[in-house]
Design a protein with these regions (language model features):
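Juxtamembrane intracellular "pre-TM" segments in multi-pass secondary transporters
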Residues: 3-38
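A single, central transmembrane helix in multi-pass transporters
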Residues: 26-84, 138, 172
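Loop-to-transmembrane helix entry/capping segments in MFS-fold secondary transporters
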Residues: 68-69, 151-163
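Helix-to-loop junctions at the C-terminal end of transmembrane segments
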Residues: 84-98, 182-183
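Cytoplasmic membrane-interface "Motif A"-like loop-to-helix N-cap segments
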Residues: 91-107, 188
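C-terminal ends and interior cores of transmembrane alpha-helices
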Residues: 107-121
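Catalytic core of membrane glycerolipid acyltransferases/transacylases, capturing the structured
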Residues: 239-296
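A cross-family acyltransferase "interaction/gating" segment
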Residues: 326-391
């Protein structure tokens, strides 16, 4: 049984012999995602350390700047950028720890590191350092939070200490390599390029694990430019159990509004003809969309049940199509077939409001707002009985929609 931290004895012989080091390293590598996050943070800090170390020499040699105020002022902008990037990262992680933005951060850091040695003006490089800081915040906030979130409480202190240990080892090694390369004549430009390739490794490491979250992050960023989405009832979506989402269908973007606040991927049912559109098919297949057609209806429902039995989230629009009259149309009974199978989870009704009159909606009610952000409301209501009929569900949502 694990001893509490206050009852553990520190033994010097074990420390000198490397027993504690081996034990702690084994602990931080036990969960692969934690280890990947630690490696990513270590690579990031190594890049940052080297860039800050060589920029002074680069500015003197290639920009002919000897006044340290300009050099230090440019690098100080990275610090302001980290603050700004951290605030933005927190905003993008308001529903869950969005590690997808770390991939965006890695992309930005890598591109800037490659770009700096090709620029000959401090007036251009200084704003790039600000952006470097913003992208750094995108990396630091979600990955650091993710390490703490994934770590067992009993070992959190050890894992955080191990995280700092690994990061410092990486930074020391990279500074030693920088000194070594500089000693043998590699100039600052080449070192920038070398750090750019380290950034490529960082991007690849994060892309292996968070590429799907990254794509959803891009969707969310694009949507936020035009829509302000307000959610209600997110507490009705369990973190782990299977969920069957059923609700109205008002626009082509309903799938996006449902997915944004949920870290778990939603398995949508979609018309088979749209599913097989050449440009969309690879994306929809990768997104585990379930194709639906009159002939293959039962097979689609059985596949939905299999996903639910695995604990996934499945979403169905019982209206069968996007509404053309801005009202909730009669619900089809097809989803009732799912109730004839056993699966452990909840049935959660939802209602989407605010897209009427949008270019992505079929109903036009005069509520066009071409110059303003549109406010969209998405409500997840309390779970209902799995045996609920299509008519009962339709009436329930019609009653509850006024609370949204």
């Amino acid at each position: 049984r694990e001893l509490s931290a206050s009852k553990r004895r520190f033994v010097w012989s074990r420390y000198i012999g490397g027993f504690y080091l081996r034990k702690n390293l084994k602990m931080i590598t036990r969960k692969k995602e934690i280890w990947d996050n630690i490696l990513a943070l270590s690579l990031f800090w190594s890049i940052s350390q080297v860039v800050l170390a060589i920029f002074g020499q680069y500015a003197k040699t290639y920009l002919h700047i000897t006044n340290t105020i300009y050099v230090q002022g440019s690098m100080a902008l990275a610090g302001f950028g980290i603050v700004l990037g951290s605030i933005l990262a927190a905003k993008l992680s308001r529903y869950y720890i969005n590690a997808g933005i770390a991939l965006l951060g890695a992309m930005g850091v890598t591109l800037i590191t490659f770009l700096v040695p090709h620029l000959g003006s401090i007036e251009i490089i200084a704003p790039l350092f600000l952006l470097f800081g913003v992208f750094s915040g995108f990396i630091l906030v979600p990955l650091s939070a993710n390490i703490q979130h994934l770590s067992p409480n009993a070992h959190l202190g050890t894992i955080l200490a191990g995280n700092n240990f690994i990061q410092n080892i990486f930074m020391i090694l990279f500074l030693m390599l920088t000194t070594f390369f500089a000693y043998f004549g590699m100039d600052a430009k080449m070192l920038f390029v070398l750090m750019g390739f380290v950034g490529v490794v960082l991007f690849w490491l994060l892309a292996k694990r968070y590429s799907v979250l990254f794509v959803w992050t891009l969707f969310e960023l694009l949507a936020s430019l035009r829509y302000k989405v307000v959610y209600k009832g997110l507490e009705n979506i369990p973190q782990e159990k299977a969920v069957l989402l059923l609700g109205n269908h008002v626009s082509w973007l309903d799938w996006l509004f449902l997915q944004i606040p949920l870290r778990r991927r939603i398995n949508f049912l979609m018309d088979k003809e749209i599913y097989h559109w050449p440009l969309l098919h690879p994306v929809l297949k990768a997104g585990e969309v379930i194709p639906l057609s009159p002939r293959g209806f039962k097979d689609a429902m059985k596949e939905a049940v299999r996903r639910l039995q695995k604990g996934h989230i499945v979403a169905i629009f019982p209206e069968g199509e996007i509404t053309r009259n801005c009202e909730i149309n009669p619900f089809h009974k097809g989803f009732e077939l799912i109730d004839s199978f056993e699966w452990d989870g909840v049935l959660v009704p939802f209602y989407i409001d605010g897209m009427q009159g949008s270019i992505f909606a079929r109903c036009k009610d005069g509520r066009k707002k071409p110059l303003f952000r549109r406010e969209v409301h998405v409500c997840f209501f309390t779970p209902q009985s799995k045996g609920i009929s299509a008519l009962e569900l339709e009436q329930f949502i019609k009653r509850k929609r006024y609370e949204c």
